[in-house]
Amino acid sequence: MESSNDFSNKDSDTVSLSPVEFSNYQCEINPGFHEFLKKSGFEDVGFRFNVVTILGSQSSGKSHLLNSLFNASFQTMDASRGHSQTTKGIWGSLVLPKDTSVSATVVFDSEGTDSRERGEGRLTFEHRSSLFCLALSDVVIVNLWYNSMGNLTGSNYGLLKTVVEANLELVDTNNEENYKTVLFFCVRDWSPSLSPLNVVKDYVLNNYMRSIWNEISKPARFENMGVESLFEIRVFGLSNAVTQPELFEKDVKEVKKTWESLKPKEYSRRVPSDGFFVYSKNVWKTIIEQNHLDIPTQKEMLSSYRCSEIKTAILESATTSVPELTETDFSEYLMSLLNKVESEYFSQASRYDPKVSEKVGKELLSQLCGKFQPCFESALAGYVKKLAVESSSLLDKEFTVNSSGKELKVANARPYTVWPSFSKKCEELQSKQSEKLSEHLSRFKVSFNKTVSFEYEFDAQPLKDHLNLLVSTEFEVLRSRHLGLLKQQLDSMCNSTFVMVKNNLLDRSLTEDEFWDYFDELFDETHKNCMDQLTTSYQGLVNRASKAEFAQLSLVLLLKAARHNFDELQNNLEQLLLERFDKFFNYQEFKGELVPTEWHKQSAQELNNRYKESKEDALTLLKVLKKTKTKKMPSFDLNDVKKNQYFYSTLGEPVSDKYSTPVTEQFALEVTNSCSKKFLEMYKNAQVVQNAGTSISSWRNIPPIFWLVLLVLGWNELRSVFKVLLRFYVVIPLLIVFYFTFSYSATKLLGPKADQYVKPVRDKVLSLFTALLAWFVRTLHMIASKSSSFKQRPAT
């Protein structure tokens, strides 16, 4: 049950909030009590609060007394309806001062003892409530009726015994020195006329407390101590509240005054307000479960719980928005954040157990750094990439490729001498870069020494793994490039071999069996040369590769290259046949060399026979290429090869064991028909040359007398031509040379005056040149006229 209104007297310095149930009749904790403390602002007061609890018989006026002392509003019994249980379980109210510098007060009203409604279970609840009140309170009020003093049950003797035993249990587990529980005995319906207050005090102290102390069994360390060593005891006599309300109010003020003078400035249990509910809940839960109530352990548990709560809240707040950090500002930002977080944490956690708060504080800083692991990796990613690129550059420089010349060079040397050390160099560079990264990462070690001393090293393994991956990727690019060059070397060796094959195909004595035996031997020799020259190179480029692997690879590549070359040959088969025919038909051997055939010296029969033989010999190539030969492939286990290996697919793909694809009959027929036409054209050309050689006489066969007659008859014409040529080609150049020589010499000797001598000479030379040119034209015209008249003269 909860009242809806807060109670405040205008003359009072405090505000009392409506009570809220802490534990119900079944001893179950009410979570609403925590919300009640939160909403009231109680969790912000720190240690500036006190706790007051009350114990006493049912219907003894406990709630009324608390209402009178603290201006509270606990529910009280309606006597007009008879005596019955009013307060069930444990209820709590909060008294807040209007002056925030004054301590607040938590007031607990517990269910009365000796309850008929509880029946046989009342003793269990009495023990629980007593232990709970003693564990929490700065002061425990024991409410007694004056008329019941001396009675065993009515005087709460059993309750007091429980209180002493429970307090002894608490003190025995508490390590704090001078730990005393304050007990306020409020004797109700007392009057000076009944008994002096001193007598009542002595009675309570001797007949109750000391008597109980002597009865109970105590730990050895308390055997020689009195009850006063554990309790601070005050006894108050309270007048009847109904018949003497003014005196009752006066007596209550005396109790309140004493409380104000005795209450500690801060909560004596050293539990801060924000952890009070958790502490209270754990204490009650431990009591209910009938476990040993260890107050230091409870405080440590509370400290651990609250510090963890503070840690979680601060950690979440600090990592909500983390900016993108570069390598240069990462450490500065992190140290600034650690200082801020540590200061914020200890501003709240310092109220709890120092050992626990420091331990959780270190956990906070460690977890905060852990939250920055992705940020750390991101900030250092650029440096890792830089190392990877640098390693690639160093390796590329170490194995510089120069293919501009006729021969491939790697690091200015033959590749076969350099490639064997490739993988070893890769490992050395990778190890060097990894060490370089480790040295660089050591600068990011966190050393923190403020309230707590703390060191943290970020996990460098992800960055190292990333570096290894990047470096391996960069190296694989270079490795693939060099493996490609190695493949080119294999292809080049095969192509060089095939030049010899093509020359062999032009041999006139070519036969099927001899050619394929020759090619088989040549192929084996080429494969052996590849193994001898390139095995160590391959093993250097592909780390831990076996000799058998390269033997298989080189065999596969050579077979593919052979098939490719034979395919190219078949694509150009017509041209090759024409070359064979041309060689056999148009050329003949002379002193060990091929020379063109002199067709004009050949007879028609010889030409026909030569054509027939050359054609047959040329087409022999088709018979050779209609056959092929197989190469026995050794067994090879592909499981021994890594799947990311450059040549994995090459080694895994099915390869034909045949050197070539045989020429089909249809293709051979088509090529034969096409070539026959061109053979015929070459034959006809030879016939033309032969016929021309027999019909046209050579100039060497003309008799010498013919040349003598020609000279005599044409002498006049020859003389005229020579005369013209002599004058035109000799005199004119001499005039030009004379003019320029005279002009140059005169200018050198006479300077500006030379012009008066040069000009007349120039004019004279020009006039002579004009006259000679005119004579040359007239002479040519005259010769042309004579020639024309000679042609028109009738024959006699």
From Swiss-Prot:
GO terms for biological process: endoplasmic reticulum membrane fusion. The chain crosses the membrane at residues 702-722, 726-746. Residues 1-701, 747-796 are cytoplasmic. Residues 46-280 form the GB1/RHD3-type G domain. One of its GO terms (cellular component) is endoplasmic reticulum membrane. It is found in: Endoplasmic reticulum membrane. It holds the Pfam family RHD3_GTPase. GO terms for molecular function: GTP binding; GTPase activity. InterPro entries: G_GB1_RHD3_dom, P-loop_NTPase, RHD3/Sey1, Sey1/RHD3-like_3HB. Its EC number is 3.6.5.-. Residues 723-725 are lumenal. GTP binds at G56, S57, Q58, S59, S60, G61, K62, S63. Residues 554-626 form a coiled coil. Keywords: Coiled coil, Endoplasmic reticulum, GTP-binding, Hydrolase, Membrane, Nucleotide-binding, Transmembrane, Transmembrane helix. It is a multi-pass membrane protein. Disulfide bonds: none annotated. Probable GTP-binding protein that may be involved in cell development. HAMAP family: Sey1. Belongs to the TRAFAC class dynamin-like GTPase superfamily. GB1/RHD3 GTPase family. RHD3 subfamily. This is Protein SEY1 homolog. It comes from Theileria parva.
